[in-house]
C-alpha cells in the first residue's frame, strides 16, 4: 500500500480527512509513483514472487482517469483497479480497501469519518457493488455484512445471479489462498489446555513488554 501511491496529497494534506482527499500530479508524473509496485512489489525475488495483497489509498487521483473522466476514490475507480491494477499489471492477489470508505461521509470537511470520496451520492450498498465490480475483494474496517448482502442482490438484478456468484467466489478464492499459504488449514487443531497455558501467560507478556520498551524512540 498505497495504490497508486500515497505521496501526492494536494498541499501535503492528509487523506484521512475530506480536506485531503485529492492526489494531484501537476508535473504529469503519475507513472513514477507506480514504480514501487510495478518494479518491486509485483516482481519480488524468491518464491514469494509478488505481493499477496494491495490496498488502494483513500485519495481521488485527480485527472488520472482519461478513459472514463471520473474523479473518485481509488477503490471506486474502474480505471485504476480494473484497467490498470487487474488488467495492465495482471495483479491476481487480494485488493483490500483502505479503512472505512463505504459509509456515508462526515458533515464537515474536517470530520474524521468515512472517506467515500467522489461517490457520496450513492448508497453504501451501491458503493460496495462498484468496488466489487472493479475488482476489490475485501473492505477494510467494515464489520457489518448487510451492505455486502444488499450489494450482491443489486448486482444479481444488474448483472445476473450467475455472474455475481462467480465474482464473489473469485474473491473468496483469493482470500482462502492466503490462508492456505499460512498453513492454517494443514494443522487447524488446537489443544485447549495447552492454549490456556501459553496465551497471555506471564512469560510472554513480560517479553512483549520488554520488546515494546526497546522499540520506543525518544525525540
Where do the protein language model's features map onto the residues?
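Glycoside hydrolase catalytic-domain context in secreted enzymes
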Residues: 1-219
